Amino acid sequence: SGEDFLSFMRDEVFEPLGLRHTVADHTDSIITFRTSFYGKREDGTIVNAPYVDNSYKWAGGGFLSTPEDMVRFGQQHLGEGFLRAETLAELQTPQTLANGESTGYGIGWSSDEQDDGDRTYAHSGGSVGGATLLLLVPEHDLVVAGVVNISGPAARIVQRVAQVFEDHLEALE
């Protein structure tokens, strides 16, 4: 494209998708509504997370976002539109090892089958003082995003929320 990475992401992804609250985590900038990040000691005490410069990994997780923007992004992975069907298949299809065993992971998306047979795709992220999970359930046109500002997994919370929505949607069918 000839553009630097951050300009490309802004011009070709964030602006076209309306991701108004997704920005690179510039540590030297004031970012409106940037949250504080926390950790937990072994005794359960909540403490401020240490400073981390995420700019070295912008392409692999150095952005700040909101659940709303994450859901908008996830909606583009439910079906063809912003991305071609072939691209979605490439991203979501689990890779296969040389021995034929599935990795359960595509390009950025883990793939799983729930007890009810619904296929899910998920992408998690974590840094010192925060964690995220973006969960897609294409059979129900459902996207759930969770963001927590403390080190540790967000998965349990997001999976519970998704299950509530799925149960409700299935009851309507």
Language-model segments: which ranges?
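Glycine-centered structural positions embedded in regular secondary structure
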Residues: T35, G108, V143, I157-V158, ...
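Short, surface-exposed loop or secondary-structure junction motifs
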Residues: S1-S127
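A short local loop/turn or secondary-structure capping micro-motif enriched for an aromatic residue
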Residues: Y56-K57, S127-A131, G152-A155
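Short, well-ordered beta-strand elements
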Residues: A131-I150
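Short, gly/Ser/Thr-rich active-site loops of penicillin-recognizing serine hydrolases
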Residues: Q114-D118, S151-E173
